[in-house]
């Protein structure tokens, strides 16, 4: 009921309540039948019977069931709302309906009853209150027999809602062998009421109803008389014997001739003698004057008009649901594309920044003597090692660039992979790095070191040996813990001397969306071998030593080593001793 706004009560009875509600999204007015929560199974049985029928059968002259739901253990049936009934018409027209209107209504009611009977369905509660009438004059049969109409405050409820007035004699006597004729009897009683404005067999009890049936319609049949005499309810009761005219027009003088014939055919005491619904549709009352041929196009036009009105309401309700479904389909579709072709396109876009980054790292690694074709070949080996890091299984011929783009959210993984892989050959002989802040990183690197690339060519092996020779120039850079301060100072030296390399690395940082501070945390293990600028491609090992000596002389490279610490301690001791000697030699000032 969260989607509906309650506007008021339509009816209330022993089985449930009928509420007039408004859909909050579409504004459509509906009637919701709410069944009471009862421990007995009769309520659920009645509700499930109605739900099963309404879901199975659809007709222009039957009320439409919109939806069914259960809330707080109560069954809710949502119907289209038509607030006008034949009973309302009779209250407005006290002397009965006009003949043309009456014939149109009866024809539509018979169409609904014939549809039910053709499907072996018995309504069992046909009465003016259960015949809905739309504004365009379309009648629809409904089943609100479980609820009774609400009277004004202070008014007394009548027995009309019990529908006793329209019960066939076999139902009154509780005969178990009743069928479709009970609806025909109720139709005959309703026709008289619609034509005259007064109920034909109003009664206060079953015995009163039987007495009036005998007086106005006819005596009981032998079968029904036998049931009556054996019934303990009617024990000791004697019904009168009345002689009735056989002519229908004399029997029902207030009715039109043809209409009296229909009523007479409907109100037969023996159920086997009653007319069928299909025969009633072909009665002269409906076939004369070409009524059916004229009224059917009019009826279809009205039904089409109402369908258009309903179509203006229902798409509003279904449009939001359809939009949600379309969004879900789009989401599923885009996810599918991302997992297949779109992912490949995005990865191809990321190829260039990754290649640039690899080249810059090679410059940092001191591979200045490697030509460009060799770099491309080495990138193939690097991609194979990166593929070993990835979870996705790759074939030996697949390059890393086609696996996944760099992750800007977690740059440490990509940085470590790209920074360490160029030195994987030399790091095979490197002693374990014991860094307090990067144990996890060192462990990840070692896991990759013991899986060398199969695609490493002889040229890559030569570069590996050259990298080992370069690494042997400064053995302290591999064996000593550089520490975070040394890594920062090494960064400063590198930034001062390699302006062009900084520009390229800054471009790569923007593309990969990580800051310089993030790189400081992860790249310090190989900083000692990255102090060589890109412009020193043809330099020899001696020139590298000269650069490193000059870097030690600069103010920015005040990196304490073990030797420097010992020398500083000796200097401090010497200066301290000299000061004490001077103080001793100074004369005392009085």
Curated annotation (Swiss-Prot):
Residue positions of the active site: 125 (proton acceptor)
Binding-site residues, ATP: 10-18, 33
Positions occupied by motif [NKR]KIAxRE: 45-51
Residues with PTM Phosphothreonine: 158
Modified residues (Phosphotyrosine): 160
Compositional bias per record (Basic and acidic residues), positions renumbered to this chain: 547-556, 580-590
EC number from the UniProt entry: 2.7.11.22
Keywords, in A-Z order: ATP-binding, Cytoplasm, Kinase, Nucleotide-binding, Phosphoprotein, Serine/threonine-protein kinase, Transferase
Gene3D superfamilies recorded: Phosphorylase Kinase, domain 1 (3.30.200.20), Transferase(Phosphotransferase) domain 1 (1.10.510.10)
Catalytic function, reaction form: L-seryl-[protein] + ATP = O-phospho-L-seryl-[protein] + ADP + H(+); L-threonyl-[protein] + ATP = O-phospho-L-threonyl-[protein] + ADP + H(+)
Family as reported in the entry's similarity comment: Belongs to the protein kinase superfamily. CMGC Ser/Thr protein kinase family. CDC2/CDKX subfamily.
Protein name in the entry: Cyclin-dependent kinase-like 3
Organism per entry: Macaca fascicularis
